[in-house]
């Protein structure tokens, strides 16, 4: 046992006999920049919509860059989904998405992100009123917001942070219309045939943007090996930067 204490004792003796260097108090780290916008811990189902509308009008932007180890996706956000767009911008600027991963990946369907087991930023679980527009459909690259199913959520209120990006599959016009919950336009049917998508989600979830660059990144993430819960076995981290 003595050998284990010998070196620390010698070091202690040397420290006592050596002059002590002058010590200085380390400077405090700079405070993080203050990001304008509503306090994420105070948003609720009842006040989120008006506060987010006001935020979007005061701090508008229409494009973000979503960065992953598989590459980047440039996403254009829609003007006519102002609540969802403002919410996505707010959480992006506050750094919420930078602490998240793609947590549910279903190849041939969609990749879902916005969740993390290690989030340090406090955020309340408020929901968003639906902004479902017939002109925004679930083509490949569509960006929508997840929600609980209609049995417990008949108002189709969206999650505040769980978003998804459509991969989908190419479908004939007949297949697309049969899968869709509403009447599709000829242009939408043609898009499902050439670009692909998941028409079964149309009319059920709010689509508030689309990938305009980096569609191939969707396929790379969708090809990740996943566990039984569809969570990729190797985390696909997310970083989101507001562009304009």
Task: Describe each PLM feature range.
Residues 1-14:
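Sec-dependent bacterial lipoprotein signal peptides
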Residues 16-244:
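Cyclophilin-like peptidyl-prolyl cis-trans isomerases
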